[in-house]
Structure formats: C-alpha cells, structure tokens
A protein has these predicted regions:
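Short, charged low-complexity linear segments at domain edges
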Residues: 1-4, 19-41, 150-153, 240-258
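Short, glycine/acidic-rich beta->alpha junctions
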Residues: 6, 48, 101-105
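Long, charge-dense tracts
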Residues: 8-11
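Iron-sulfur cluster-binding cysteine motifs and their immediate structural context
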Residues: 13-41, 49-71
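Iron-sulfur-associated redox domains of electron-transfer enzymes in respiratory
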Residues: 63-333
Length: 333
C-alpha cells in the first residue's frame, strides 16, 4: 500500500474517485460510505501498480505532463483548457431538455453515442442507489436508463472503482468530475486495460460538492426528525435552474429553490472542492456547464456552455447539430 495514499486517507483528503480500488489486482478493495463520502477500504492482500500515486488526484496529478501526453501540447489558456470549439445551447428534444440539469446536452450526446453504436454502455452517476439519499456509478444500457440518470448530484460519487467490472469486449462512455477525468487519463496513459474501454469522457463543469451529512442537516432545519426516512431525492427537479426536492416516508414533500440551499456549501463543502484547480473538466472530450447568465436565466428552459476538447467529439457534435438534435450557437473565446 502506498504510504502517500495512507496519508491522504488519514488526513481526510480523499477525493472519492475510486481509482485506487480499481487498480487493486487482488480484487479485495472496495469503497465504503462515510459521512464524508465514499472512501477506499483495502485488505492485507491489496496490490497496486507503481503508477498508483500518479493517478491519485489527492496526491496530485501532473497536469502539464498529462496535457503533453493527451493533447500533445499545453493549453493556450490554463483557465479554459484545450479547446476545439465553445458553444451555448441545449437539446432540441423538449423532454430531454426539461429533464436535464441545464440544457440536456450531456443526456442527448450519450443517447446519440448509444444509438449510433459508438458505445455499448454509459457509466453514469445515479441517485437512489442503494438508498434514496445515496448515489453510485451505474452502467446504463438503454436510452431510458440514460435519461433516468439525468440531473445533477452534489454529493461525492466514486466513479472509477467500477472500471474493474467492465467487459473488455465492450466500449463505454463515462460522465465524471474533473479530477476523475484526469485520473482516468493517467490510467489510460499507463495502459490500464479497463480504462482503455472508455472511449468517450463527457464531464460537467464542477464548482462545489457537499458532504452527505448536509442532507440531514438541511432536513433538521425544516423540522424533520431523523427517523422520517427519505424516499426520493432530486437535486435539480423541475424547470431550470431547478429545486431540491425531498420526499419523506411521512408523506411530506420539501422543495427548495437551488439558490436557497446553497447556504449549505460553506458548512459542508468537500476537501476535494477546496483543493481542486480544475473546474472545467480539462480532460473530458466534451465539457458541459450551466450557462449562468442573466440573459439565459431570464429566458428559462435550461442553457448550457458546451466545450469540445477533442476532434472526435467536435465531429460528433457537428453531426448532432446537422441532425437537429442540438441547438447550439458558436461563441467567441
């Protein structure tokens, strides 16, 4: 076991990515739930490759080296990352746009990849597994399953531990946070076989995440007792920008506009959020974020900033635009 990773865990600095668990050749490591999010649990038989430290976001991923490997050069702008094109817009499909966290672009793109046989499955974060207030990585293998995983999730979800369960004969897309995308690229750089099954990385812009304890703290502020269990939780329900919706066993339903529950951030913000230097998913093929602009907020409906970072993804987005699957406007950057 890496002493550096042991120190990361001891100091409470784990980024919850799950990369180390996927690299354990013994197969005995797994992620456990804690009030500070998922963290790895290792066994005495755990064995890891020499590059494990390089892939750990909490130890620190060498972005300049990774840029030279993946993009073959350094970015012109370190705030924005490598870019093919920047656009704003949304899915042309009203139902997908409405169900998405912003403009439904990620969902629409995943459906396109699946229906056109670019992928056999999409690895997504899904709220409600194994219990309503928790979330897990999930492999969607149908359009309905992809749509069912729409929406944002603001608690840590380990996305890379599932790599060890992938079928080497299949192709996948994955949605993951910036630090997870970078870690995945390190795994690919080191020819880790399961990581090579990931053909497309589609990542959201990421500002802050909060620890799971924030949910119960919020409910206490609404006079909800701890024994009143959660039966459903949606972070961005309803029309964009959405509202937090929590349904309880008692039958009570609590809805709070997104901007109103942001007060939880200073008290429950994750260490990963505080440490992160990447908010725009620099190693995703496609990076998508909310278009937080008074212009778009007044229009309603949900709008996204859509950034293509690789030529293969630019080609896909252009095809989707030509087929009227996406309504996108090119922006100057």
């Amino acid at each position: 076991m890496s002493k550096d990773i042991e120190k990361v865990l001891k100091e409470g600095c784990c980024s919850h990515c799950g990369s180390c668990v996927s690299l354990d050749s013994s197969g005995e490591s797994y992620m456990i739930d804690t009030k500070y999010g998922p963290i790895p649990k290792f066994s005495s038989k755990s064995e890891f490759p020499s590059f494990i430290n390089d892939a750990c976001p909490s130890i620190g991923i060498n972005y300049p080296d990774l840029y030279k490997y993946f993009y073959k050069n350094l970015p012109k702008n370190w705030l924005l990352g490598s870019i093919e094109n920047v656009r704003t817009g949304y899915s042309s499909q009203k139902a997908i746009r409405k169900k998405g966290a912003s403009g439904g672009v990620i969902t629409q793109t995943l459906i396109y990849l699946f229906e056109n046989k670019y992928i056999d499955g999409a690895i997504l974060a899904k709220q409600g597994i194994p219990t309503p207030e928790k979330a897990r990585a999930f492999i969607a293998r149908s359009v309905d399953e992809i749509i069912d995983c729409s929406q944002s999730i603001y608690i840590p979800v380990s996305m890379l531990d599932i790599l060890k369960d992938l079928n080497p004969k299949e192709k996948y897309a994955i949605t993951c946070l910036p630090d997870q995308s970078a870690s995945l690229r390190v795994l690919q750089k080191n020819m880790y076989s399961p990581a090579l099954s990931i053909k497309y990385v589609i990542g959201p812009y990421t500002g802050t995440a909060i620890y799971p304890e924030a949910i119960r703290s919020f409910l206490r502020s609404k006079k909800v007792r701890d024994h009143d269990l959660i039966t459903s939780l949606k972070w961005r329900a309803g029309e964009w920008p959405g509202y937090l919706e929590i349904k309880l066993q008692s039958g009570r339903i609590i809805r709070t506009p997104k901007v109103y529950y942001n007060y939880l951030i200073p008290f429950f913000i994750t260490n990963t959020s505080l440490q992160s230097m990447d908010f725009v998913n620099e190693f995703a093929d496609l990076a998508v974020g909310d278009a937080w602009s008074p212009k778009y907020e007044n229009m309603g409906g949900g709008h996204s900033v859509v950034v293509t970072r690789t030529k293969k993804m630019e080609k896909i987005i252009l095809d989707m635009i030509s087929k009227d699957l996406l309504k996108l406007k090119k922006e100057v950057y």
